[in-house]
């Protein structure tokens, strides 16, 4: 299982999301750790050969996103967590 490495305030930002959104994104990150991909996760285009993945979750209060990379063999770097305005 790959370890998560949180960049900047990404972990704190995720903790501010609604509980249901946190749970679903947490499940998506777990799947990534296991080498799989959540059905709401998709690669971001336009970044060359970088393997950057975005998980999107919606609820009544908006759309929430977490961006991570799976480039490293032992780690998943969670780059950013934010609410789309």
Where would I find each of the regions flagged by the language model?
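Basic, Lys/Arg-enriched alpha-helical interface segments
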Residues: 1-63, 72-76, 85
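Conserved catalytic cores of phosphodiester-cleaving nucleases, focusing on short active-site segments
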Residues: 79
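Catalytic DNA-binding helix-loop module of base-excision-repair DNA glycosylases/AP lyases
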Residues: 69
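Portal/gating segments that form or line small-molecule/metal binding sites
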Residues: 66
């Amino acid at each position: 299982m790959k370890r998560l490495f949180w960049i900047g305030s990404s972990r704190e930002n995720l903790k501010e999301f609604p509980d249901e959104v946190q749970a679903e994104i947490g499940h998506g990150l777990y799947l990534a750790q296991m080498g799989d991909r959540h059905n709401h996760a998709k690669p971001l285009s336009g970044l060359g050969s970088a393997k950057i993945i975005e998980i999107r979750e919606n609820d009544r209060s908006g759309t929430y996103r977490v961006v991570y990379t799976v480039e490293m063999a032992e780690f998943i770097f969670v780059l950013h967590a934010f609410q789309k305005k």
